[in-house]
């Protein structure tokens, strides 16, 4: 019964699950247990990381990239294949050195698209909210109802904030809600799915080139 409910949860969460994505989203998550190395080596790795970013962008593979305050960041690749993107990532010195916990996910925008920002780049900051599903015995039967309430809540919220993008990752991997401005902790926690523990909201500040989400 639990397996059936989880399957229904995945279907409800991502109605585009069977679609082939146009882009692949990568999280470079902070890695608390990464090896401690000399500052000179860190600089060498990060210089190589930036060089590799520029190369992938010039080749038309990497469409958008940006760091989070506090470390880590994101990539958005022009590809429909997770395996292909994993192969491209092997050229990154930071990935080679295991400096991040890397997640590679299909990307399904519901609001906002993905565009290659034009030079000269204007870096901007956005509030970046990631919703991570937390499936537990005490919330599994409420999932369809809570996820609908979550989507309805974001629709209402969109009327009061400047939404840059909203997207899901398919296969019950959650999604993101990115805004120009700041949503308070109280408002985020008032989301029914967050309040009931079905979704964990991770809030960060993202630096990215203006126009990366096709925003004006």
What are these language model-derived features?
Residues 1-22:
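Bacterial Sec-dependent N-terminal signal peptides
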Residues 19-216:
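Conserved, structured core segments of small domains
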């Amino acid at each position: 019964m639990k397996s059936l409910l989880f399957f229904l949860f995945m279907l409800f969460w991502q109605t585009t699950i069977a679609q082939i994505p146009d882009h692949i989203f990568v999280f470079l998550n902070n890695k608390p247990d990464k090896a401690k190395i000399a500052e000179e080596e860190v600089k060498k790795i990060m210089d190589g990381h930036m060089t590799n970013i520029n190369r992938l962008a010039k080749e038309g593979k990497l469409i958008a990239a940006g760091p989070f305050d506090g470390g880590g960041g994101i990539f958005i690749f022009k590809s429909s294949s997770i395996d292909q993107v994993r192969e491209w990532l092997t050229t990154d010195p930071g990935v080679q050195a295991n400096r991040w916990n890397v997640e590679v996910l299909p990307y399904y925008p519901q609001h906002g698209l993905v565009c290659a920002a034009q030079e000269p780049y204007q870096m901007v900051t956005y509030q970046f909210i990631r919703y991570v599903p937390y499936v537990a015995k005490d919330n599994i039967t409420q999932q369809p109802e809570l996820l609908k309430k979550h989507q309805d809540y974001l629709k209402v919220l969109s009327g009061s904030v400047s939404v840059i993008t909203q997207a899901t990752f398919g296969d019950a991997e959650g999604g993101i809600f990115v805004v120009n401005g700041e949503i308070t902790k109280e408002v985020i926690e008032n989301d029914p799915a967050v309040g009931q523990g079905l979704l964990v909201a991770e809030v960060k500040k993202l630096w990215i080139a203006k126009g990366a989400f096709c925003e004006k």
